From Swiss-Prot:
Its main location: nucleus. One of its GO terms (biological process) is response to hypoxia. The gene is pqm-1. Disulfide bonds: none annotated. Interacts with ceh-60. This is Zinc finger transcription factor pqm-1. It comes from Caenorhabditis elegans.
Length: 295
């Protein structure tokens, strides 16, 4: 009995330590295996396709999002989300690219722009705007509009008042109204010397032109008598304004003549009515009884 002699047999063979450590799979290897298995699972099984009738398969466009590598899918999804958030801003910036250009960018409004703005703002027919020799626009002149005829050509801005015809800005309303009257309403003043094409907006420049170009001496004083109204004490600033003032007198005289004729006709009718004697009306007698008192 060998176990009594402490003989338990041959000792078990001891395993020698491994020479090399086993290689653990990395996360990239695991993701690659998952991607490969996903692709393999999507492949058709030949054993199941033997006894089946082939069906027509439509040619669908390749969708790259169905065959993504999981290692890069997260980054692509993040980029797609960022693009979806930025899409409204990009579209808004593209839509506003054409709105940056407008009439405010141009220092002067062209004739076509002025006609377009007038036709869009009002339902009336566009005014017949003409150009003079200096290229300034002449707006239609109508005395029936009254003293506020320049109001539709004046627009209030942050810096003052702007002429909508030539886009010039003045500090006061009276200044821009005078500008509209002189430069865009009254016709230009021409030089009366033969074969001279000089024109200007200011009457004083005509005298300077005649003195400098034609040697005509300047007048010693302003002849206010030629610009004085024969019907009242008014003195106009220019011959054109004097003609307008006299025309108003003629309109008033015509209205006064009409009113006088109406008054004469009314008084004649009243006199004819007074000459007619009123007809006598018969009054029936009213029977009266003496007062009676009953007790």
């Amino acid at each position: 009995m060998s176990f009594l002699n402490n003989d338990f047999g041959s000792p078990p063979a001891t395993s020698s330590p491994p020479t090399t450590m086993p290689k653990l799979p990395t996360i990239q290897d695991m993701l690659n295996n998952i991607g490969a298995s996903t692709v393999n699972l999507m492949q058709p099984n030949p054993y199941l396709m033997q006894n089946q009738i082939p069906l027509p398969v439509p040619n669908l466009p390749l969708n790259p999002f169905l065959h993504l590598n999981p290692a890069i899918s997260q980054e692509i999804i993040q980029q797609f989300i960022a693009m979806s958030f930025n899409t409204p801003n990009v579209l808004a910036s593209i839509a506003n690219m054409g709105d940056d250009e407008g009439p405010s960018c141009n220092p002067k409004m062209r004739r076509g722009d002025l006609l377009k703005s007038v036709s869009m703002d009002s339902t009336e027919d566009p005014p017949s705007i003409t150009l003079d020799n200096n290229g300034d626009m002449i707006v239609p002149n109508n005395d029936k509009e009254g003293w506020c005829r320049n109001k539709k050509y004046i627009e209030q801005t942050e810096n003052g008042y702007m002429c909508t015809v030539c886009r010039k800005v003045y500090g006061r309303y009276n200044s821009v109204s005078y500008h509209v009257t002189i430069y865009h309403r009254n016709p230009p003043i021409k030089c009366n010397v033969p074969n001279c094409q000089f024109t200007t907006r200011e009457a004083r420049y005509i005298h300077f032109h005649k003195n400098y170009r034609h040697g005509i001496p300047l007048p010693e004083s302003i002849d206010q008598g030629s610009r004085k109204c024969p019907h009242c004490r008014h003195v106009s600033k220019s011959p054109a304004m004097l003609e307008k003032h006299i025309r108003r007198h003629q309109i008033k005289d015509g209205l006064s003549n009409i009113n006088e004729a109406i008054r004469e006709r009314t008084s004649t009718i009243c006199d004819e009515a007074m000459e007619i004697e009123p007809a006598e009306t018969e009054v029936d007698p009213i029977e009266t009884k003496p007062r009676s008192c009953t007790l």
